[in-house]
Amino acid sequence: MKIYEQHKTDKDHIATPRYVVEDIYNLIDIDSFKSIWFPFNNYDSEFKLRADELNLKYKATHIFDDLGNDFFTTEPPANCDLMISNPPFSNQNEIIERSFRLIKENKIKSFALL
């Protein structure tokens, strides 16, 4: 069993419904972003699935996966102009801190966390 499948039932894992992702994408004009990072949305995430349908350029990773990705050490894609995701709440303070650090280091231009 993959690590993701083991953690999918954790109380910290709450999948974002498709209609919410569609509304967010419309509100922020998702097509205007050229390099997007979904740091908590690999596998079956609606963020990723909808991005595929829209042919968006993105990098999708997850805080727990079988590829060794970890939000706190994984680098965003080059020229990342948007990092967007619904991260686990148990790490919210650390996630917000790193998000602002990534902006300060010019590794991402903007972020949106649910």
Protein language model regions, located:
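S-adenosyl-L-methionine
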Residues: 1-56, 60
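Poly-acidic low-complexity segments
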Residues: 17, 29, 64-72
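A short helix->loop->beta-strand "cap" motif at the edges of active sites that frequently abuts
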Residues: 56, 105-109
